Amino acid sequence: MLIATPYEDLLRLVLDCGVAKMDRTGTGTRSLFGQQLRYDLSVGFPLVTTKKVHFKSVVYELLWFLRGDSNVAWLHEHGVNIWDEWASSTGDLGPIYGVQWRSWPTSSGDYIDQISTALDLLRTEPDSRRIIVSAWNVGEIPQMALPPCHAFFQFYVAQGRLSCQLYQRSADMFLGVPFNIASYALLTHMMAAQSGLLVGEFVWTGGDCHIYDNHVEQVQLQLSREPRAYPELFLAQRDSIFDYVYEDVVVTNYDPHPAIKAPVAI
């Protein structure tokens, strides 16, 4: 069976053709601008197989975002520490993703729950071109521990199927992107289930797509491996998208190559 490998293909392109650039962390990168990946979610769940992705962390982080939370305490309760490097001494991260998704502040002093608004539109106006969620709140970026990398996403309905396109301004191709692809693919499944729709495509669009100089050996190892078939996702039925728990999300037939460790650029 022919296995589609859009992520690995882009990883190889950045490795071979990326332009040398410095970055905020001082690490150095190989970078390409304006790239896109497409996944048909109806034929498999896009969890990278050329290295093991820690799917537990993917699920708990998404549930944490959907809670509107921005303190790592809840993640710690579930054994997830992926945000620790950026958290304050009290565990706070400022008004990052979940806060913007669930309680975007307005000039009148109110708050907008963008996830609920998007769901309402999917149910009542599925042809709307305004089914958008943004984490890029310019006025609150100075208070965020880290400005949003995956900043903006849009939903699209056609022929009873829900698709999602994400714009990721800054894309750490080795460590971050496999995680982000899985997270937004899962979110698309959840939003579809809550809207009475089937899943369509997940489209990932990257701005600065980069490989850090200290990830090159790891990338070369990953690209030497033979990709395997994508797993399947099973999602329990819940009355609300905010009711999902970790046990509701099950991935089967995930047979990845071993994990590859690499340093995080902070």
From Swiss-Prot:
Catalyzed reaction equations: dUMP + (6R)-5,10-methylene-5,6,7,8-tetrahydrofolate = 7,8-dihydrofolate + dTMP
SUPFAM superfamilies in the record: Thymidylate synthase/dCMP hydroxymethylase (SSF55831)
UniProt-recorded Gene Ontology molecular function terms: thymidylate synthase activity
Subunit structure: Homodimer.
Pathway stated in the Swiss-Prot or TrEMBL entry: Pyrimidine metabolism; dTTP biosynthesis
Function: Catalyzes the reductive methylation of 2'-deoxyuridine-5'-monophosphate (dUMP) to 2'-deoxythymidine-5'-monophosphate (dTMP) while utilizing 5,10-methylenetetrahydrofolate (mTHF) as the methyl donor and reductant in the reaction, yielding dihydrofolate (DHF) as a by-product. This enzymatic reaction provides an intracellular de novo source of dTMP, an essential precursor for DNA biosynthesis.
A GO cellular-component term linked to this record: cytosol
Protein name per UniProt: Thymidylate synthase
Keywords tagged on the record: Cytoplasm, Methyltransferase, Nucleotide biosynthesis, Transferase
Gene3D superfamilies per UniProt: Thymidylate synthase/dCMP hydroxymethylase domain
Record gene name: thyA
